[in-house]
């Protein structure tokens, strides 16, 4: 696989909109999609979906169901009733839509995203599209990486709601991509990462306490991402 071109992050005119949109999506992932999925299946792992991210399809009382985020909308796919599209407004409204209290938890992790049920969830359409495209790019790279190393029994690619990143693992090494970090520390720009479960000391390839990261501005094609993941696998093995 080669030559997969990807729009530069400069398509987002204001980085602040990327940060606020990412924060809103993190809230929805942690406090709505994951708790709803956990009560139905006992699992929390989400997926990259067309237009954004969402639950894997699952069956509740014999009915196929999935909730996902597509751009500015929360989409409920209920087999037989079709899809219903709802504007993203607040955590309280999103939770009520799926029949959850706004303070719902999974019992698997402690949510760290904003939890005010009445605060507006600020979603910018350009930033939402940028995040969706980044997840598509990361998913493409991870699936090719998994295919190359099928003999090592890689895990499936999942979007982890507590971190809001897309990742898989090979042995005791995580490989993934984040749309950026929350809070005042970390990386504002989307980035790829390699995270050994027992991180090596910082130095050389290992440029983060958890392992290694490569910012979006240094990545042009899927081949670039694959080269980074391959370097990480070799360095950690």
Language-model segments: which ranges?
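Surface-exposed beta-loop interaction hotspot
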Residues: 92-157
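Long, compositionally biased interface segments
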Residues: 201-237
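Charged, low-complexity surface segments at secondary-structure and domain boundaries
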Residues: 5-15, 78-81, 112-127, 212-219
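N-terminal ordered "arm"
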Residues: 1-70
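Amphipathic, interaction-prone secondary-structure segments
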Residues: 41-72, 153-196
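Hydrophobic, ordered structural segments
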Residues: 65-112
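Short, Φ-rich (hydrophobic/aromatic) sequence segments
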Residues: 18-36, 134-146, 225-233
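Alpha-helix initiation/capping motif
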Residues: 49, 89-90, 124, 215
């Amino acid at each position: 696989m080669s030559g997969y071109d990807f729009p530069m992050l400069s398509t987002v005119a204001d980085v602040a909109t990327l940060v606020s949109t990412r924060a809103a999506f993190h809230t929805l992932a942690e406090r709505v999609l994951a708790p709803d999925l956990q009560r139905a299946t006992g699992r929390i792992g989400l997926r990259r979906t067309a237009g954004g991210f969402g639950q894997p399809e699952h069956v509740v009382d014999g009915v196929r169901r999935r909730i996902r985020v597509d751009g500015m909308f929360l989409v409920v796919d209920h087999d037989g009733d079709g899809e219903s599209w709802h504007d993203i407004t607040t955590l309280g409204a999103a939770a009520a839509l799926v029949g959850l209290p706004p303070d719902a938890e999974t019992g698997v992790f402690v949510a760290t995203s904003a939890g005010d049920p009445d605060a507006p969830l600020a979603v910018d359409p350009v930033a939402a599209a940028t995040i969706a495209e980044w997840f598509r790019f990361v998913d493409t790279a991870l699936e090719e990486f998994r295919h190359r190393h099928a003999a090592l029994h890689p895990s499936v690619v999942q979007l982890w709601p507590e971190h809001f990143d897309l990742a898989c693992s090979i042995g005791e090494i995580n490989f993934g991509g984040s749309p950026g970090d929350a809070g005042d520390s970390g990386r504002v720009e989307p980035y790829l990462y390699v995270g050994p479960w027992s991180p090596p000391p910082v130095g050389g390839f290992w440029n983060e306490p958890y392992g290694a990261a490569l910012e979006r501005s240094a990545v042009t094609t899927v081949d670039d991402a694959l080269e980074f993941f391959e370097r990480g696998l070799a360095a950690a093995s």
